[in-house]
Amino acid sequence: MSIALAGVVTSCDMDAPTQSTLDETSVFSQYSLAESEIMSIHVSFCQTNSYRGRFLPYYGLNSDLETGSGTQPSYSKAMSYDDKNSLWAYNTLATNGQMNTDNNAYAMFYEGIERANLAIQGIRKYGHIENNRDMAQLLGEALTLRALIYNDLIKAWGDVPARLQPNNADNVYMPRCNRDSIYKVLLADLKEAEDYCYWPNENVITKSTERVSKSFVKGLRARIALYAGGYGLRGDGYRKSKDPELASDKMYAIAKQECVDIINQHCNTLGSFEENFKKLCQDNVAAGGESLWEIPFASGRGRVVYTYGIKHQAADQYTSQNQGGANGPLPYLYYDYDKDDIRRDITCIPYEWSKDLVDGKSYQQLRGINKWCFGKYRYEWMKSERALSLGKNDDGVNWQYMRLADVYLMAAEAINALDNDQQTAWKYMKPVLDRALPAAKVEALKAKYTANQEAFFNGIVEQRGFEFAGEMLRKADLVRWGIIDEKMAEAKQKLTDLSNRAGSYKDLPLKLYYKNEGENIVIYGLNHGDTDAEGAALDGYSSKQWFVDSKTGANLLTEDYINGLYVGKPSLNCLWPIWQTFIEKSNGLLNNDGNYGQLSD
């Protein structure tokens, strides 16, 4: 048997893996060679059209928090099936030009699954895991990475073929499989993997967030349980599973236990909100902090800052790339935060770095109300020797797949839903809020959220939004909660109100007032209650029309923008079709009939 080997690396290395004629026995009985097989799974994450350039930039848009900022929502473009807009606007065709290729994310995910299948089979046969903890760790990693990929396949495509054995003559063509069956395999696999994987820093292998630890295995199992027990689009409509083994209470019980286990182990700690993202941008992969696992992009791969970072209009003192700002927050998100919430000014950024350079340096300048950037990922937070030597497109910053704040909030959600115990649930929400808000405001939220079960659930919905905006968890959360239609309609109304400075946004000034202090911009007019009279009286400040085009007077948040957020009913269009190229090569076993080809039972 020919085994594909990749170099032993801790990040995705995009050099083509070498081919070896070593037999399966030799590869999977030696730790270093078996480890190479685990690393080869990472390569599939990082291919050009896999997570790097297709799944991470597009899955998760549009939500009630996140949208395109470079290419913006557009009803007219979505209705004419513009490739990018229709991917976001809940009306995607199987022939989409961004996706309908043989090397797209759908194919790369199955490539990663095949590599995981080979590793799982080989290590089980020849790894002697009962006598070798490190080989057992590798088996746990393979099981976990396969579960991760399958979970993302289901999020995007729903019922998909279940390839759980290496490819052979008997499984070349496979139909869709009910996702419930896959979920049950994943939950069982992850339970097994828990027995194999080390806790963070328990072993040299798990000293890095680029390697799977028991904390991540448990966290992923909790996340998958919440998806399995929640709503999704099926062949007969948008509903929860009918399988009693995946009943919501059973899935919440799994999520509760797994999350509480992670927290009680004390192997991971919450630092400050900003610290987490600075460490991410600086390639600090030391385990034990907030990060549980990251997609390990190599220095020459990955478009995290390119896609989700603050826009730089030119190569400047911080980066050799004129990138960033492709995706950003919906314009109202900034105004929905409490003004004292430290997450607001880290998550939502109204400025960019200038194209014009002064003494070779750019400076911050206002963008537009329809062009906000995310601020969790920044070239200016990267190590300068790295950021100033980047190629045209890739920045090499890892994608943080899960962090400890998610574990705390999943625990809080599960305890509220399962036990109807708001006081205990609050104990798991509180650490996330303590680092974000002043103590008095945390206490006020406690009174609001712990009033009853519904109030606490609404608090979870609200705080997961404020905590994870820009991390692309929101769309899947809205789907599993069964509220995606409600929240997306609310998003359109909020955009309409913001455009007209009405409703919750009626107390905002028409203009923003700003000045530069060195390279940094100082802005007045972004807080509720700020006024144009006060702004105009500020010494040394310039002003900019924020809501309307300064030349035409037309609203920048146009009807085309607002209605472009979604054009199909979100709950019935929350999946992508399997791309046409794969349908045509499926020997008639795959289709997108009905609700995107989904099964009813």
Where are these regions (language model features)?
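Bacterial Sec-dependent N-terminal signal peptides
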Residues: 1-20, 477-480
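C-terminal substrate/ligand-recognition segments
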Residues: 91-96, 342-430, 579-601
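Conserved, well-structured interaction surfaces
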Residues: 30-31, 35-36, 43-49, 75-157, ...
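An aromatic- and glycine-enriched ligand-binding surface/loop that stacks and positions planar moieties
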Residues: 13-81, 160, 183, 187, ...
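Long, intrinsically disordered, low-complexity segments
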Residues: 12-14, 109-112, 187, 208, ...
